[in-house]
């Protein structure tokens, strides 16, 4: 019985390494872009089981414009309207929206990106600049990785 337990344990460890190595081979992909660029190939990569996250540098400006829309010209009145809007939305919701809206800026700084669009692989391991076709960006990454 003890020998069976050891074999079963070794078998589980072997499968664990196999699954972990397969997961490690699939890159995690983040795209930093703006409204000026049309990113293609997202669905094709997701259908291959790849994780793709797209962050837009214009989301922050868009959120500020949305929240600040139709504010009165008077500064005190505008402040009151904003406070009412934030209260209606809830503090946690407002914070979450701002964090999401500025995530592209945060990632750009974190990864030291010098321009965009940028396709980032594996949390900054490699960056492909200027390519908006994610299938092509992945191909370039795989060629680089194979060298």
Locate predicted features:
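C-terminal partner/receptor-binding element of secreted or periplasmic proteins
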Residues: 127-147
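Thioredoxin-like thiol-disulfide oxidoreductase module
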Residues: 86, 90-114
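Conserved segment of the thioredoxin-like fold in thiol-based oxidoreductases
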Residues: 66-96
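N-terminal secretory signal peptides that target proteins for export/translocation
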Residues: 1-5
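Bacterial N-terminal signal peptides
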Residues: 6-20
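Structured segments of extracytoplasmic/periplasmic soluble domains
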Residues: 45, 110-111, 119, 140-147
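Local sequence-structure signature of Cys/Sec-based thiol-disulfide redox active-site neighborhoods
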Residues: 23-69
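A short, hydrophobic beta-strand/beta-hairpin element that forms part of a small beta-sheet core
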Residues: 116-127
């Amino acid at each position: 019985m003890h020998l069976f337990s050891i074999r079963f344990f070794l078998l589980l460890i072997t499968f664990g390494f196999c699954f972990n190595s397969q997961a490690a081979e699939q890159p995690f992909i983040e795209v930093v872009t703006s409204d000026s660029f049309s990113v293609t190939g997202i669905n094709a990569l997701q259908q291959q089981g790849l994780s793709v996250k797209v962050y837009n540098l214009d989301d922050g400006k868009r959120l500020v414009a949305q929240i600040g829309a139709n504010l009165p010209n008077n500064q005190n009145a505008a402040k009151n309207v904003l406070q009412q809007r934030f209260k209606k939305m809830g503090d946690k919701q407002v914070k979450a929206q701002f964090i999401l809206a500025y995530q592209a800026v945060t990632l750009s700084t974190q990864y030291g990106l010098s321009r965009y669009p940028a396709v980032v692989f594996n949390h900054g391991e490699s960056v492909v600049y200027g390519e908006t076709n994610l299938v092509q960006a992945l191909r370039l990454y795989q060629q680089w990785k194979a060298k």
